[in-house]
């Protein structure tokens, strides 16, 4: 029989939240505002990227639709459906093509293909027939080569890694291997530091590179931050001050780090304490501004709120990467 006179734990304060913030509770914190509703359905939105004309492209992973959003009118159109299963990221090449990473069967059939903004003229860049990668995300460097993340593995089975593909798309060089579900990836403004999120072990990697872009500098591979909670860090981007913005999947927020990997701020989705809009996956800046767009969905809340883009102002203007150079 319970003794009512014993000290008793109660749900008060932070413990009342569906996704409590403990270690980062003292950080500068803002709450995002609704920007565009993509769908009334719960879609796994991902892959935010802008073209040279400032139009936003994104996708939903499980149905494979590629969307385009006009920031001026907030009009949403479906451009095409991915020819490959489970697309996970879009990056715009300087020539205007969309490079689309796809996860395939989440085991051995992922890859990257390039296409036009209408989904025409498909070109295999990393073929799912010739590799065992499960490719989640990529980032171009100024030479036109790119780094990509291999999304394979589990917390106790680190099969994933990070690789570099030369500008001619013929040579693939490993950067780091034996990590678990490599996910988001970003490159510093001087291209000397590569950031990688490792989802199922809740880690942030900071990789200092030598001038060749593939050799890790002495003592250059570090883990400056360990995240807490379920599920973990997802896609990321940088601003022009080299701050890193990391979406926290399953937590309804984005954490912001300075160029040394120290947390300096966070962005919350409305309703997160009640378990709403928790699947934050990708932050991205509107070109030439400090306005940050964040995609999320309400699948964990029976899709009540659908699939949304939210917005806030970041610390600095977004960094205009390869497609704008």
Swiss-Prot record:
Its EC number is 3.1.1.-. It holds the Pfam family SGL. Keywords: Calcium, Cytoplasm, Hydrolase, Metal-binding. It is found in: Cytoplasm. Ca(2+) 1 binds at residues 46, 136, 183, 234-235. The keyword Hydrolase applies. GO terms for cellular component: cytoplasm. It comes from the Bacteria. Ca(2+) 2 binds at residues 108, 110, 128, 131, 133. It is an enzyme of class 3 (hydrolase). Its cofactor is Ca(2+). InterPro entries: 6-blade_b-propeller_TolB-like, SGL, SMP-30/CGR1_Lactonase. GO terms for molecular function: hydrolase activity; metal ion binding. The active site is at 234 (proton donor). Binds 2 Ca(2+) ions per subunit. Belongs to the SMP-30/CGR1 family. Exhibits lactonase activity. Acts in cells with perturbed membrane integrity and is possibly related to the membrane homeostasis. This is Lactonase drp35. The gene is drp35.
């Amino acid at each position: 029989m319970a003794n009512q006179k014993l000290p008793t734990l109660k749900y008060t304060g932070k413990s009342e939240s569906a996704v409590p913030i403990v270690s980062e509770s003292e950080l500068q914190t803002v709450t995002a505002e609704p920007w565009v509703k993509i769908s009334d359905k719960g879609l796994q939105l991902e892959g935010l990227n802008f073209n040279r004309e400032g139009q936003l492209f994104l996708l939903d992973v499980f149905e494979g639709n590629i969307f385009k959003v006009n920031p001026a009118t907030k009009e949403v159109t479906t451009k095409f459906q991915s020819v490959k299963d489970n697309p996970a990221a879009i990056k715009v090449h300087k020539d205007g093509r969309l490079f689309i990473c796809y996860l395939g069967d989440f085991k051995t059939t992922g890859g990257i293909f390039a296409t036009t903004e209408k989904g025409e003229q498909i070109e295999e860049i990393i073929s799912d027939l010739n590799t065992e990668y499960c490719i989640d995300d990529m980032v171009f460097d100024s030479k036109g080569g790119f780094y990509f993340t291999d999304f394979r593995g589990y917390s106790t089975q680190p099969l994933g890694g990070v690789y570099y593909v030369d500008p001619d798309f013929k040579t693939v060089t490993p950067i780091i291997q034996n990590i678990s579900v490599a996910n988001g990836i970003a490159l510093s403004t001087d291209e000397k530091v590569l950031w990688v999120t490792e989802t199922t072990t809740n880690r942030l990697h900071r990789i200092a590179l030598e001038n060749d872009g593939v050799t890790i500098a002495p003592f250059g591979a570090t883990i400056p931050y360990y995240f807490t909670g379920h599920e973990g860090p997802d896609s990321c981007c940088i601003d022009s001050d080299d701050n890193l913005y990391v979406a926290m999947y399953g937590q309804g927020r984005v954490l912001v780090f300075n160029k040394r990997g120290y947390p300096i701020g966070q962005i919350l989705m409305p309703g997160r304490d009640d378990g709403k809009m928790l699947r934050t996956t990708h932050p991205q800046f509107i070109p030439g501004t400090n306005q940050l767009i964040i995609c999320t969905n309400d699948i964990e809340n029976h899709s009540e709120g659908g699939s949304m883009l939210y917005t806030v102002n970041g610390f600095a203007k977004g960094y205009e990467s390869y497609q704008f150079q």
